[in-house]
Amino acid sequence: MRPLAGAHTMFSCVDFTPGAVVPLHSHPHEQLGVVLQGELEMEIGGERRALRPGDAYVIPGGVQHGARAHAGPVRVLDVFYPLREDYLKLFK
């Protein structure tokens, strides 16, 4: 799904295949999210959490984080502030 952006905030729906890995990384944007489908393990600032549908997370800007999808498809809804210009350019 294409990201949806307002003047200052955006959201993006992300689908993961089973076993997909998002390596540890950081960005200056605050990121909030909720798991819509499936299960994944997230590492945020050195702390690991198992997340299921309905679970939410908050990632402050500049904090290292990554994820690993478990069996079955995983879908999350991420919200970013400020806008992720890099994401928006990918979908132009």
Predicted segments, located by residue:
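A short glycine-rich, His/Asp/Glu-containing loop-to-beta-strand
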Residues: 1-23, 78-79
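Structural motif
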Residues: 10, 39-41, 48, 64, ...
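Double-stranded beta-helix
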Residues: 10, 66-92
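Short, conserved beta-strand element in jelly-roll/cupin
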Residues: 15-17, 27-42
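A short, acidic/glycine-rich surface segment
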Residues: 20-23, 44, 88
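Short beta-strand His + acidic residue motifs that chelate non-heme Fe in jelly-roll/DSBH
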Residues: 24, 42, 59, 65-70
